[in-house]
């Protein structure tokens, strides 16, 4: 049927078929509203307008040079041709028609008609207007406010053009003509609003009219002048700074000058009163600088775009392209794009010995037009590869995963990797491409300094009734973006990608008069979902909240993504305004995103949990605030379990759950070690644990018991002890072991461990739910809260932090007679509160940091002993800490060591005993091990192995709910 209509149309010499997309419609047969519902884009017949009338809100331009298209989606034209631009959001490429067909045109090849008032040109200069008279300035102040003006000219093509009043069926029209002309009127007809898609850039001015006053003509699209035109011209202002200078201004400068002279429109957002300060409001520059920084911080935190610019429209949004830069030597290696499945493998000997090559990779999310048409469709981002050193000896391999499969029942398409030296093409297939399941490996030779590589599905044959989508199963990705914290009113963005590479952030910039003064806002990826899309079609994206307090505001057309956008592979974005009915009751909630096709069938849906609202800080005080210095306060979320915790009472009692042994050898050590016991043959020793610890002694590795001998706790060689049993011999020498004595003995090595105070503070604020119990355990008994801080605090975590700050001050006070160790006092208090898990976590953090500091210049040796880390991996650990000369300073060498130890400990597992034990053994295997001079890691190992014994002895049996976690 479609082919027959095309042939009839062509034989009658009426119109050729549109090359990019569209449905053929014969206007003479009559078009009803119902029949136009199925129209995806304007047909060529609908574009046969009179020369003096353009298509809806299209802007007329003239070609200044010839252009021959390189793909079917672009439009061919010659110098002097008149074109009508429908969409300018593409930047370098505009979407236009020439009364015969539609397609993309390069913006640099055309010039707007009457470009002195054109919204399409930002580089043209407006000359000689500064020389006009005062009367001319009155009539030519084209940028004045038109508030209250209602323009409804009678357009000559209203009755003849079926598309002029059917904006709901035409994705290229921003709205009905009445909506455009009566933008400021309070009484608007009940019609569908314009599609709130960031894929299109709405015109900056509501309408342009034609005036012959003083011989000047200003037109966006021609129409019949009415009395409203004259009323509008009488409202033009003469105090515009544009007319006060003799120089020429670009349209960008005009928008800035107009923003300075005209008061901005009132914002309809939640943060209505948030306005940038002006220098005139302050007496000195420093006060203005402080106020400006505070405003900027507040504006970025609330993420309300209307606070960044007074234009009530939504800003232009673009994804942050994922990129990485790495330098490799002759040993080769691998470079992977962060948060993607895209990597480059460089073989050994790729460059000469002593040379290096810098490799830069970037994922470009919007593919060029050449790669998406009826025959071809991209299934990966375009990967930009830049190489610095071209003196190479081998090829490199690009590996990436794709979310597509070709249909086995119709082998008419294949997955192809294409390459080009330019972003816009032309692209040619890469022969050395190998596919393994969903992974494709590409062998790149004939390397260039800059290359662009993409994976596409290409159909071998295309007919009028089928395209490449009929021969593949393709997945698209839906990403939901929003601010870091939710607020009573905020905006979210739903983005659709033609591949599985969704960026972690979206940058949002305000589009309007004050766009240049507004910094971009970064929206974070809340969640993403993949689903199979059988063909390019209109998708209805709905968003729903699971809480009645939050309302999602979006009209029906703002929920639609057009099929031709998906076909072109462009990133489509939808905006949803979410507001709270009760601004004082804000909490996180769940958003459900639902995708429906044009038949109202559900294709996919998924749920995303929103972030938390920003935490409330304590009362501000002009006095010194020693407990709110760190940024970690904003990250504290107190566990619900910690709030209801009842901390048990530490009991002073003798430890009875012990085994005893007889020493069968006398040991006197020449090199003293406070954690290795000295003993006499025939004496009795108490064994705190039957578990054997494998450590290196003076010469070789041995197995050890933890023993208690004559008031001292330490290690004893297993072969030197004959285990007797649990009955205490009568000739046992030394004092009985009590819980307090055990705690004092095992906490001795804590004072020699290195710690980061901010990290300790954060962990305690997150896990302690009772500042009173914490203060009592630190011997601050019955002291009021004002003893620790100067202001009353509403937050329990901040109260805990104030007690911790007081402990730190007392330990660092040099005037006190009794010297205290911060680490030991803290651990003792936590053990008295039965927070054994918290002690184990802090001890492991202290041990890893202390080891990194002690072993800093020799950390590579330790990494090789612990995990057999390769040279390339070691370089990767040091890369973030190199200075401008490419070297890691000796004083900063602990940083890569700490990064490695954290990664290694996470791979070992959750057992803090195993981590410390394996670390000790790894240090023992080093050449000239540091454990020979630094003995306190041995004491720490004794500590973590005695925690269970201490807890079972110091606390009476109680229900599990009464213990702290």
UniProtKB/Swiss-Prot annotation:
Q: Where is the SH3 domain?
A: 56-115, 656-726
List the InterPro entries hit by this protein, alphabetically. DEATH_SH3BP4, SH3-like_dom_sf, SH3_domain, SH3BP4_C, SH3BP4_SH3, UPA_SH3BP4, ZU5_dom
**Annotated GO MF terms:** GDP-dissociation inhibitor activity
**One of the GO BP terms on file:** protein localization to lysosome
Major subcellular site: membrane
Say what the protein does: Possible role in regulating endocytosis of the transferrin receptor at the plasma membrane. Alternatively, may function as a negative regulator of the amino acid-induced TOR signaling by inhibiting the formation of active Rag GTPase complexes. Preferentially binds inactive Rag GTPase complexes and prevents their interaction with the mTORC1 complex inhibiting its relocalization to lysosomes and its activation. Thereby, may indirectly regulate cell growth, proliferation and autophagy.
Domain remarks: The SH3 domain mediates localization to the clathrin-coated pits and vesicles.
Q: What is this protein called?
A: SH3 domain-binding protein 4-A
Q: Which organism is it from?
A: Danio rerio
